[in-house]
Amino acid sequence: MNRQESINSFNSDETSSLSDVESQQPQQYIPSESGSKSNMAPNQLKLTRTETVKSLQDMGVSSKAPVPDVNAPQSSKNKIFPEEYTLETPTGLVPVATLHSIGRTSTAISRTRTRQIDGASSPSSNEDALESDNNEKGKEGDSSGANDEAPDLDPEIEFVTFVTGDPENPHNWPAWIRWSYTVLLSILVICVAYGSACISGGLGTVEKKYHVGMEAAILSVSLMVIGFSLGPLIWSPVSDLYGRRVAYFVSMGLYVIFNIPCALAPNLGSLLACRFLCGVWSSSGLCLVGGSIADMFPSETRGKAIAFFAFAPYVGPVVGPLVNGFISVSTGRMDLIFWVNMAFAGVMWIISSAIPETYAPVILKRKAARLRKETGNPKIMTEQEAQGVSMGEMMRACLLRPLYFSVTEPVLVATCFYVCLIYSLLYAFFFAFPVIFGELYGYKDNLVGLMFIPIVIGALWALATTFYCENKYLQIVKQRKPTPEDRLLGAKIGAPFAAIALWILGATAYKHIIWVGPASAGLAFGFGMVLIYYSLNNYIIDCYVQYASSALATKVFLRSAGGAAFPLFTIQMYHKLNLHWGSWLLAFISTAMIALPFAFSYWGKGLRHKLSKKDYSIDSIE
């Protein structure tokens, strides 16, 4: 084969006439000054060297495709080159033909895509659409005759990767920059979570302005939390297609704008509608920041960084009544609460928009577009571009699969229920404390807000403890292959503290007992809730590693639903059951849930194999 007869110059024994020595030495692509011209004739294409079979094998690429990273695009399935977003190669280009030579073949989804382009039909069942993955080769839909006869991806396609030491790869950014971005993004989560509970420190101002009861005023909190559960349906696809930075810029910009009608709302209906939309817009901070942090750290070291993300959504709501109780008492103005919230959101909007793009698929997509322009080769692309992205795939990844998991995965549902309980209890505290410290002790909103400080202190204590848990996990990784159950140490430590906090709260809610008694319950609860969330979040990821985003979406929906529901009956519960039994009822439930992390630690693997329709966990990875 003559070099000038081929668009891509990949080297292999089957396709190259170069010498064996030359064919095993990949050459780095160097753009020319004329590379900016995109309308090149075929004989004017700038040829580039790409990876060979040997160079890929030397980097550990084998015939068996690994499970995609948790941050890989969810709209594409059965990738033949899932390491594209994490692997660095000397040339930055990997031909499909070379992958075929190694033993990687096009998958059912890519063949289906080709048939659709060619105009052929490709019917499949809903179950196949939801469950098709690398471990289901022998199932219906993956081994059909139609699939075997379908053509593979064009062998002249060249997949783009990061080059060795690529400064565009977020993993290669200096450590201080990555940790700085981690802290800033965690503050973004605190900002969003703060916004959900900001009005809880001044519900009396809502009652006074609109002449409504407390139950109606509480809806201004609940509806924003409900918005958190629906927003990911918008921002996850936007992030997959256009990147994290675009999603933050658009969503946080809308959030800032919609705080204006919240402050100026002429009636309660307008306020509630705008609060719901604020939840939808701002939810990008809750559903994408964990991914942004994971983008910047390899899987071996991202655990400690993710701990900051686990800390933020539980501390943010606590800051709401802490700050706005003083605004409510000193000014009595509801609108000022939203102006302060808008200012905080505006600052974080600017900061989040200034953080560079961290999502590897989008970075590589832009790099591929640049290389196509410089070389004139239209077949340089990412695997996501080669397979194509359809709205149907987006809907399956973002909506249908989470719903599917919620009815077919009992282990996931039980884990999500515990996360939902802890999150709901946090929002219950926002309305239990005003009853205990406001009605019993006679404190005003500003002093009631100060009672939330112990929760923050407990959460900070838990954040430090997550580093201990992470070090223990890394020790296990060095000794043997880890299991999802190894992630449960934090939950086993934190679960008793969350229950103890509620027992203390009920036992000390007497006027003759100094306020330190019930306030100290916040220390134990803050410590327990962060550890439980940190641990169970990692457990869900490891149990459903192949579809982690969908499993986490199920968690977000159930958690937000619980967080929205609990405030609606907390005050009535404390009034009907009294201050002691109101807390003890929740304490009984929390005490029963202590068994969950311990039970899963001992029997989790067996339960997953018996109760789950399929094993999605890291245990299934050879």
From Swiss-Prot:
CDD domains: MFS_Tpo1_MDR_like (cd17323)
Induction: By transcription factor HAA1 in response to acetaldehyde accumulation.
Chain ranges passing through the membrane: 183-203, 216-236, 246-266, 276-296, 306-326, 336-356, 417-437, 447-467, 488-508, 513-533, 551-571, 584-604
Primary localization: membrane
Disulphide-bonded residues: none
GO term, biological process aspect, one: spermine transport
Protein task: Cell membrane polyamine/proton antiporter, involved in the detoxification of excess polyamines in the cytoplasm. Recognizes spermine, but not spermidine.
Stated family: Belongs to the major facilitator superfamily. DHA1 family. Polyamines/proton antiporter (TC 2.A.1.2.16) subfamily.
Name the record gives this protein: Polyamine transporter 3
Organism this protein belongs to: Saccharomyces cerevisiae (strain ATCC 204508 / S288c)
